[in-house]
Structure formats: structure tokens, C-alpha cells
């Protein structure tokens, strides 16, 4: 099946334009403005003022393969002398009743259902609707995953941020919370789970109907159920029962006992920290096949990505910590997001930032040896800074006119900047005030909604200080500061150390951000242990001087008075322990020392990771040559023994070689990298996690004749360096051979498909197929991204990187403009993270000025592109702009 990209985009553009014309029709009916696409903010405000005490009694029959037959009774209190409007975008309605009286189906317009005031009562109302909703692998509110291993089907819902109205008619906005009662009819061999607990089950005529308890108040995006022949494992600890559901074919691979134990620990810690018990009736979790993101916090039925939670090969420390962090994140949501929910999706950061930050706090206490704050830095700061220093950045609080734009709010600002800012807030006010404010916030708004002002108000009150300036600068102000270190040394002493703020982008305005940070000063040690001395890998150095000082940043320029008169340093770092939210611009002395070997003597792994990050920022700003960074990295990697730092270094090494290096230098640097990585992967003296990271990096970089031969050798053996070569690693090798167009690639691909017939193997085969180096394959995949209704989003998003491999830019450049032209379709028809993945892959699969000009021309050709989409394009095009600049600077 093939569709020409230009034809497809023309249809999408015409459809979008027709919709916009239709919306311009004027009318004197004041409610008509509310009946357009999505849920507008004015509609949401109006309904929140006229509708209350909502209850949904929802019945669904999911015995058919592609549709669910449903009935919902909506009870609510209505005030005011006006109509009521429900939201509905499902397949079709079959009947509408309002307080026992019929409404014509024409009351629905494809987006909403209007109930005239004459059919409503002042006070209690009951409306009933009969409907049919879609079931499909993608693009539907009920996702169907077919397991080819045993022929089973599994269903689950995913309604975030505003797709509940595809499942059933409802008031689909977060501040109209409702109590929900499910009734689910399924095939008799299936299990069903939902937000509530099962109270009874009735069997008849080859089906089973389960009735569930009424929930506590929930926002519509949190309503959820799942159905299928799940295998269930239950654990009871201190009277709390938690069940894990996983599909039958993967049950033996699942470490159910570990996952349940981690969940019990997570809930216990959160209950203690928040000072209130788990706020919902039950807690079950399920591993969802083809789940399009990491997890979703539905109360009572928390869903996780199956592939991220089932380890098909021995997991490294980062993978184990990542899985536990995801559990902690979703458990934290039960209080922050579920118990107390943002009033509108402009405050999305409130729940996501808090969940990530609380997960880090919990991990630090529950796993003291995990270096949780180093993990937090590596997981959040590079991603946050990478977006927040672009011209497409947004404030944490993102103005949102309509919920159909809410998907655009998801990204690094919400998930990575927000928790980083909360860490600064916690440090600023102190732990006692922070926790007391959180307690009061949860108490005041339990089972209701709140705003960021409510949160800062309580924390500020607990700390006895106003946080108005903090809110203005970190919640409402776009962008971020850069902090330049200015070091003056005289007679072997520090004469002055000054920290100077400036905005990373002019859109932030010139004012300083109020912050507190800690400054680290690395002094020379007697015996010549300085940047020019003999190399001493990763030792902890001691000095009689105080090494770090707290500093309040309240002005554009701030002197570190405590540093005055101290020994002239080897280097300085302005954000020790990562409390500040700013990009550190190192002084020339520090850059010279760190890039000449001093970095190798820093014994603190957390500090070392941040210093590597500061040097990488020098590379991205075209101030440090990428080949110099690669050489430094390769010289230090053999000595680095931190399992969390090594993967970060290897990722940057790969980017510097594959994207930033001038073509004339690629062959030499790649050969050095292949040698270092191959030796490291086979060095049995290294911890497993480091050897695995070296092997993964080798697979991602190998391109020489010798490198390809080594890749092929991995497929010919059962083990390497004492470790089994499992299928996930074999697939990575196959992917690389396909990207390179190696002579053995197709044979290896066919052999691996025959070898690995598991559900995960079939997914990986689809992903690998996108890497095949032919124009016909690219055309076929691009068409399937739009036209294949059986293609689920997890598979599609997973293949985007292979489709856009840097080594195949000549094949993929023709698809860059069609990919950009399709953005309205992607936003309307794909889930929350797909848009960012799409843009990141298609734009940053390129390093050429021609690709950059394609992006710029797209923006110039669409001056009326919706603001949120323009921002997403600008966020993602920043990297290719840097790439082109770096390659020109260091060619």
C-alpha cells in the first residue's frame, strides 16, 4: 500500500482549511461559539460554573472486534437558565434522552451534544445516551492489541489528555470531576479491570458482565478499563492487596514479584511523605502491550509499557533504576494529579513535574546507593536545557485556548524543567516548609482541582515568605538563564569570582532569575596534582580549603564573596549539587583545565557528570571542537567506572561523531572509537553495566570494514565476554547492518526474524525494517504511518529513528517537507508524545544546510501555523541549526 506524500498532505491541508472556514460562520446564538471543535477554555469555564456533582454510569459491551456498544447515564446538577453541552466524538449515537424525554440525534454535531434548557431541571438531571465507540490498534479510545503468539486480543483505554469523549459522551474537562460506575461485558474467558473493584459478575449467552464499584471523583482523562485474557499475580503486604496483570504469552518473562514489591514500597513511602493514606479504593497495575508511552496513572488500574518493564536481557543499573523511577512517578500521581488535579491543562506541569520530583526524592531514600540525584540530573537537565534555550520554548504555565491543543503541552518543559524548578524551590524554602506546604495543598484540594498559585501560596505560607517573584520567573516566564563564570586571579589567589546572568534567548527579557545555588571550587593539591600533572584516574582529592559555598543570585551580576582570597583554582563550577536551574558557561581557566585532564581526577560521580555536561554545552555552542571532545571522552572512558555516567558519555560521543564531526575527520575518530569500545565491551574486569554500555555504543557507531565484521561476529556466537548475546542485542546489530546497507544485512534480518518470533521480536522486526536502505522501503513506511489503521503507535514511533538514520539522509530528505506538512494531521490523530518524536526524528535525522533550509522555508510558507505547532518546530530545529553551525565552525 503506497500513497504519494504530496497527495496525502494536500488532502490533509484541504480538510484542515475546510474546517477553519466552517468555524468562521457567524451567529447570534451565544452558545454556538462553544459548539466548535474540541473543548474551548470559555466552554470549560462556563460549564464549571453551571454543572456540578457529576456521575457517570457507563456500560460497555466489548465482545465485537472493532466496536464497543455502550450506554451511559449522566447525572449532574445544573444551575442557571441555559442549555447544557456534552462532548462526543465517537463513532455514532443511537439514542439520546434527557430526563426521560427524547432528543433528536441532530442534537449532536460531531463534537458536542446540546441539551436544550427546556429539557433540563434546575438541580438534579439525568441524561442517557446510547452509542457505539471504535476499537482499533491506534486512533481510537479503546486500543486493541492482537497477540500473534496465541491469537489473543487485549483491550485497554487511554484517554489522556482529552479523548474521553471518543469513548462515551461526557463533560471532558479536568475540573468537572465525576464518580464513575463501570459495567463491562466481555467474552467469558476474559478478565476485566477498571478504576473500581468488581462487585459481581453475571454470565449468559457466551459472555460475562462485570459490575464495578463507584469510584471517588475522577477527571475524565483518568477513567480507564482493560479487558482480555490477562494473567494475574496478587501480593498482600500489611493488609494491602495489589494485583499485576500481564498478557499470557509474556507472563513467564515478567518478574511479577519484584514489580509488586517495588509498588508496595512506593505506596508506603508516598503515604508517609504526603501525610495521608492512598486516596483510592484499590491499586492494580498492568503491563500494556504496544503502550505508546512509559506509564499512565489511572487510579485503580495503573498502566505501564510492557516492553520497558519486561527485561529480555540482563538489565543494567540505569534500566533497573529507570523502571523503579517510573513506578514511583505513577504512584506519586495518585496524590499529585489524581487526588488533586490541575484545573486546566495549562497547569499540566503541576502534576507531571511533581510526580518526577517526588519519584527522585523517594528513590534517594529507598535506594540510598542509587545516586538518585545524579540520575535526576542526567534524566532531566540536559533535556530541559535542550528545549528551554530554543526560540520555541514556553513557560511552565502554558496558555491553552482549547483542549484539542493540549497534546502540544507535553514535552521537556513539563516533564524535565518542572521537576528541576521544584528542586530549586525545595532548596530555596527548606525541606520542612516544602513538605508542610504540600501537606496543606493536598488537604485543601483533595478530590478537587487547583492551580500553581495554590501550591506556591501554601509553600510560601509554610516558609514565611512570598513566592510571587519565584512564580513570575519560573512559572510564567519563558526561557532560562545562562550563568557566566567570571574568574579573576592575582598572585595565586582569587581576586574576584563573579556569576553573571543573561537570558539564553531574548524572548525571556533581561531581568535576572532569583535563585540559590552552590559554587564548587577545585583547588590544586600539593604534589603537582593539577591539570598539567600526571594522569591520576578518578581519585577523591582533598584540600584544607572549603570547596563549596551557597550563593544567592538576585541580580544580573553576583560576586561570590566567600571565594575572595582563596587559592587560585583548577576549575570552578557554579551549580554544585544541581540546585540551580541555569546553563553554566565555564570560564576559560575551567574549560582549559577540564579539557586537559582535570576532569579525570574528580572523584565525585555526580559532580563529574555535571562537568561533562558543561563541556558538552561548549561543544553544542561551537566553542569546543567535537573531535577534541571525542578524543577526551575516549581517553577517559577506560577509567570511568560509574555505570550511570558511562552511558551519558557514550551517547554524546556517538552524537559528536555521527552528527558534528567534519566528514574529513569521521573515519579516523570512528576507528579510534571502535577500538576503544570493542575492547571495553570485552573487558571482563569492568562491571556488566559498563561492558553492556560499551557494546551498545560500539553497535551504534561501527561502520568500518573491521567494525562490520565484528558486528557480524556477534550474530554468529551465543555469548561474548562471558555474557549471552540475547535477542535485543541481536536486533540492534541487525538494525545497524541495515542502516549501513551491509552485504550481509538482508540475510541477518531474515535469520533474526526466524529466530525471534515473540511479540517483542515482531515489534523489533517492524522497527528494523524501516532502516532498510532503499527508496521503496522509505516510501512504503511513510505511507503506512498515515494509512495503515492496523499499525499501533508504539511500533510507528519506535521506527522513526531507523527510518531517519543519519547515514541515509539522501533517502530521507525528500520526506522532510511532507513530514512537516502533515503536522496538523499528526496532532489531531496521534497521542501525546508522538508529535515530538515525529519532529525530532524527521528534522534531526539530518545534518545538512539543505535540511535546515527546508525547515525554515516550511515556517516561512506557513505564517499562520498554530502557535503550538510553530513552537514545536522551533524546539526541534534548534539542534539542526547547532549541527550546521558546528560543522561549519570546525570543518
For the regions a protein language model found, what residue spans apply to each?
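Surface-exposed, acidic/Ser/Thr-rich flexible loop segments
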Residues: 118-191, 505-517, 521-523
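Hydrophobic alpha-helical and helix-loop surface patches within well-folded domains
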Residues: 21-22, 33, 212, 243-506, ...
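Non-catalytic accessory/interaction domains
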Residues: 2, 183-186, 201, 246-248, ...
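A surface-exposed beta-strand-loop module
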Residues: 25, 84, 88-148, 169, ...
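N-terminal, polar/Ser/Thr-rich
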Residues: 22-69, 149-154, 172-174, 467-469
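Ligand-binding face of N-terminal immunoglobulin V-set domains in extracellular IgSF glycoproteins
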Residues: 69-88
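Hydrophobic helix-coil surface modules that form long, contiguous segments used
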Residues: 70, 159-162, 169-328, 357-360, ...
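Bacterial N-terminal signal peptides
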Residues: 7-19
Amino acid at each position: 500500500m503506497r500513497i504519494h506524500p504530496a497527495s496525502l498532505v494536500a488532502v490533509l491541508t484541504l480538510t484542515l482549511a475546510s474546517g477553519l472556514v466552517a468555524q468562521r460562520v457567524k451567529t447570534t446564538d451565544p452558545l454556538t461559539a462553544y459548539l466548535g471543535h474540541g473543548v474551548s477554555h470559555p466552554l470549560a469555564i462556563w460549564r464549571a460554573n453551571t454543572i456540578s456533582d457529576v456521575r457517570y454510569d457507563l456500560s460497555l459491551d466489548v465482545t465485537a472486534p472493532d466496536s464497543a456498544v455502550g450506554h451511559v447515564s449522566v447525572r449532574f446538577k445544573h444551575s442557571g437558565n441555559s442549555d447544557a453541552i456534552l462532548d462526543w466524538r465517537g463513532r455514532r449515537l443511537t439514542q439520546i434522552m434527557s430526563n426521560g424525554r427524547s432528543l433528536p440525534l441532530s442534537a449532536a454535531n460531531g463534537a458536542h451534544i446540546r441539551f436544550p434548557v427546556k429539557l433540563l431541571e434546575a438541580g438534579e438531571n439525568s441524561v442517557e445516551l446510547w452509542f457505539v465507540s471504535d476499537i482499533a490498534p491506534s486512533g481510537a479510545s479503546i486500543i486493541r492489541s492482537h497477540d500473534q503468539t496465541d491469537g489473543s486480543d487485549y483491550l485497554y483505554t487511554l484517554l489522556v489528555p482529552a479523548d474521553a469523549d471518543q469513548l462515551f459522551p461526557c463533560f471532558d474537562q479536568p475540573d468537572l470531576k465525576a464518580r464513575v460506575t463501570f459495567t463491562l461485558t466481555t467474552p467469558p474467558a476474559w478478565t476485566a479491570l477498571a478504576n473500581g473493584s468488581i462487585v459481581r459478575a453475571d454470565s449468559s449467552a457466551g459472555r460475562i458482565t462485570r459490575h464495578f464499584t463507584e469510584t471517588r471523583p475522577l477527571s475524565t482523562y483518568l477513567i480507564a478499563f482493560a479487558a482480555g485474557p490477562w494473567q494475574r499475580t496478587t501480593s498482600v503486604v500489611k493488609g494491602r492487596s495489589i494485583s499485576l496483570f500481564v498478557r499470557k504469552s509474556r507472563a513467564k518473562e515478567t518478574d511479577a514479584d519484584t514489580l509488586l514489591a517495588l509498588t508496595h514500597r512506593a505506596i508506603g513511602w508516598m503515604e508517609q511523605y504526603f501525610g495521608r493514606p492512598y486516596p483510592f479504593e484499590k491499586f492494580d497495575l498492568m503491563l500494556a502491550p504496544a503502550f505508546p508511552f512509559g506509564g499512565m496513572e489511572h487510579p485503580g488500574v495503573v498502566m505501564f509499557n510492557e516492553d520497558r518493564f519486561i527485561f529480555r536481557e540482563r538489565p543494567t543499573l540505569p534500566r533497573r533504576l529507570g523502571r523503579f523511577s517510573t513506578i514511583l512517578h505513577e504512584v506519586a500521581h495518585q496524590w499529585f494529579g489524581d487526588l488533586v488535579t490541575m484545573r486546566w491543562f495549562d497547569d499540566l506541569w503541576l502534576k507531571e513535574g511533581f510526580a518526577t520530583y517526588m519519584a527522585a526524592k523517594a528513590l534517594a531514600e529507598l535506594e540510598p546507593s542509587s545516586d538518585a540525584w545524579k540520575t535526576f540530573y542526567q534524566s532531566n537537565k540536559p533535556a530541559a536545557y535542550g528545549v528551554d534555550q530554543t526560540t520555541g520554548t514556553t513557560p511552565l504555565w502554558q496558555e491553552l485556548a482549547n483542549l484539542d491543543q493540549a497534546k502540544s503541552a507535553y514535552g521537556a518543559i513539563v516533564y524535565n524543567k518542572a521537576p528541576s524548578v521544584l528542586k530549586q524551590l525545595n532548596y530555596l524554602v527548606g525541606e520542612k516548609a516544602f513538605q508542610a506546604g504540600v501537606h496543606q495543598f493536598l488537604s485543601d484540594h483533595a478530590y478537587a482541582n487547583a492551580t500553581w498559585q495554590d501550591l506556591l501560596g501554601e509553600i510560601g505560607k509554610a516558609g514565611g515568605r512570598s513566592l510571587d517573584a519565584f512564580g513570575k520567573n519560573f512559572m510564567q516566564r519563558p526561557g532560562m538563564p545562562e550563568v557566566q563564570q567570571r574568574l579573576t586571579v592575582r598572585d595565586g589567589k582569587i581576586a574576584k569570582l563573579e556569576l553573571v546572568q543573561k537570558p539564553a534567548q531574548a524572548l525571556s527579557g533581561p531581568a535576572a532569575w532569583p535563585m540559590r545555588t552552590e559554587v564548587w571550587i577545585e583547588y590544586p593539591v600539593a604534589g603537582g596534582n593539577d591539570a598539567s600533572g600526571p594522569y591520576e584516574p578518578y581519585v577523591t582529592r582533598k584540600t584544607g580549603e572549603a570547596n563549596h559555598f551557597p550563593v544567592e543570585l538576585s541580580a544580573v551580576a553576583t560576586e561570590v564573596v566567600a571565594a575572595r582570597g582563596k587559592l587560585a583554582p583548577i576549575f570552578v563550577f557554579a551549580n554544585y549539587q544541581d540546585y540551580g536551574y541555569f546553563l553554566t558557561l565555564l570560564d576559560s581557566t575551567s574549560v582549559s583545565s577540564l579539557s586537559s585532564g582535570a576532569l579525570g581526577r574528580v572523584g565525585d560521580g555526580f559532580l563529574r557528570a555535571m562537568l561533562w555536561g558543561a563541556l558538552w554545552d561548549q561543544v553544542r555552542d561551537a566553542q569546543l571542537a567535537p573531535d577534541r571532545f571525542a578524543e577526551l571522552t575516549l581517553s577517559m572512558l577506560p577509567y570511568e567506572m560509574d555505570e550511570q555516567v558511562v552511558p551519558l558519555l557514550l551517547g554524546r560521543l556517538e552524537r559528536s561523531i555521527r552528527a558534528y564531526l567534519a566528514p574529513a575527520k569521521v573515519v579516523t575518530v570512528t576507528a579510534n572509537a571502535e577500538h576503544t569500545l570493542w575492547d571495553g565491551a570485552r573487558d571482563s574486569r569492568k562491571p556488566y553495566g559498563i561492558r553492556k554500555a560499551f557494546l551498545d555504543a560500539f553497535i551504534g557507531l561501527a561502520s568500518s570494514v573491521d567494525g562490520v565484521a565484528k558486528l557480524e561476529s556477534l550474530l554468529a556466537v551465543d555469548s561474548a565476554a562471558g555474557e549471552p548475546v540475547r535477542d535485543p542485542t541481536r536486533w540492534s546489530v541487525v538494525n545497524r547492518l541495515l542502516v549501513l546497507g551491509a552485504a550481509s544485512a538482508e540475510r541477518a534480518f531474515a535469520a533474526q526474524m526466524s529466530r525471534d518470533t515473540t511479540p517483542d521480536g515482531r515489534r523489533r522486526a517492524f522497527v528494523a525494517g524501516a532502516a532498510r536502505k532503499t527508496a521503496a522501503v522509505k516510501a512504503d513506511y511513510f505511507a503506512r504511518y498515515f494509512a495503515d489503521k492496523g499499525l499501533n503507535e508504539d511500533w510507528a514511533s519506535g521506527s522513526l529513528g531507523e527510518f531517519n538514520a543519519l547515514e541515509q539522509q539522501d533517502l530521507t530528505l525528500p520526506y522532510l517537507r511532507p513530514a512537516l506538512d502533515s503536522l496538523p494531521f499528526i496532532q489531531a490523530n496521534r497521542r501525546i508524545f508522538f508529535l515530538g518524536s515525529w519532529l525530532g526524528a524527521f528534522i534531526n535525522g539530518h545534518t545538512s544546510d539543505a535540511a535546515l533550509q527546508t525547515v525554515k522555508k516550511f515556517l516561512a510558507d506557513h505564517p499562520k501555523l498554530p502557535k503550538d505547532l510553530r513552537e514545536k518546530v522551533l524546539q526541534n530545529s534548534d539542534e539542526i541549526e547547532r549541527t550546521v553551525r558546528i560543522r561549519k565552525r570546525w570543518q
